[in-house]
Curated annotation (Swiss-Prot):
Coiled coil: none annotated. Its EC number is 7.6.2.8. It is a peripheral membrane protein. InterPro entries: AAA+_ATPase, ABC_transporter-like_ATP-bd, ABC_transporter-like_CS, ABC_transptr_BtuD, Metal_Ion_Import_ABC, P-loop_NTPase. It comes from Shigella boydii serotype 4 (strain Sb227). The gene is btuD. CDD domains: ABC_Iron-Siderophores_B12_Hemin (cd03214). It is found in: Cell inner membrane. It comes from the Bacteria. It catalyses: an R-cob(III)alamin(out) + ATP + H2O = an R-cob(III)alamin(in) + ADP + phosphate + H(+). The complex is composed of two ATP-binding proteins (BtuD), two transmembrane proteins (BtuC) and a solute-binding protein (BtuF). PROSITE patterns: ABC_TRANSPORTER_1 (PS00211), ABC_TRANSPORTER_2 (PS50893). This is Vitamin B12 import ATP-binding protein BtuD. Residues 1-233 form the ABC transporter domain.
Length: 249
């Protein structure tokens, strides 16, 4: 698979790095590790929102060489701290993220998949935390989906499963899997190690801004690696054909 983004000795003050790695088209990459590991800092750097030491190549060009307008066409980014910019109907907010604003059926499909059908006429400042999270997810999906944006290459998500119930998490997994099959590269942070074990193709395990392990999910999420990252003992079990991680006392 082609390399979409390449990081070389990326670092930010004392919070991150230096670390290196590759993001590949058609793969879901999970960033895992304890709080303060540097996951959010790394995602913001990969999104082009911050700068620091080291280099990042995006689609063969230095990330800092991309204009904001061009970057928005090729990558989408959802941070944890996003709040509604000002009051507007949800459908209007979602339309602002579409490069092809005539694709109303696509907007309705994505909204329906994330159970937002009945929220489209509501104002963005009247949403619960979970509803706003789903609106944010719908917005970045509409921004980057190859169905309407052939230039879309990379989707960056900071803890996208926050505030979602089990059904909504499953719906998002289906959307991300479909985007991945269309060739998009997806990088997301996660605190659910078993979710990573089921849904990620590859993982980067971080602690204190350093990369402890990277590679296929099964190679990274091993009890020794996790013990080093979290300071706790883990076991990996096979239950009805599915691998599962549990803490041991």
């Amino acid at each position: 698979m082609s390399i979409v983004m390449q990081l070389q000795d990326v670092a930010e003050s004392t919070r991150l790095g230096p670390l290196s790695g590759e993001v590949r088209a058609g793969e879901i990459l999970h960033l895992v590790g304890p709080n303060g590991a540097g996951k959010s800092t790394l995602l913001a750097r990969m999104a082009g929102m911050t700068s620091g030491k080291g280099s990042i190549q995006f689609a063969g060009q230095p990330l800092e060489a991309w204009s904001a307008t061009k970057l928005a066409l090729h990558r989408a980014y959802l941070s944890q701290q996003q709040t509604p910019p000002f009051a507007m109907p949800v459908w209007h907010y979602l339309t602002l993220h579409q490069h092809d604003k005539t694709r109303t059926e696509l907007l309705n499909d994505v909204a329906g998949a994330l159970a937002l059908d009945d929220k489209l006429g509501r104002s963005t400042n009247q949403l619960s935390g979970g509803e706003w999270q789903r609106v944010g997810l719908a917005a970045v999906v509409l921004q980057i989906t190859p169905q309407a944006n052939p230039a879309g290459q990379l989707l960056l998500l900071d803890e996208p499963m926050n505030s979602l119930d089990v059904a909504q998490q499953s719906a998002l997994d289906k959307i991300l899997s479909a985007l991945c099959q269309q060739g998009l590269a997806i990088v997301m942070s996660s605190h659910d190690l078993n979710h990573t074990l089921r849904h990620a193709h590859r993982a980067w395990l971080l602690k204190g801004g350093k990369m402890l392990a990277s590679g296929r999910r099964e190679e990274v999420l091993t009890p020794p690696n996790l013990a080093q990252a979290y300071g706790m003992n883990f076991r990996r079990l096979d239950i009805e054909g599915h691998r599962m991680l549990i803490l041991t006392i």
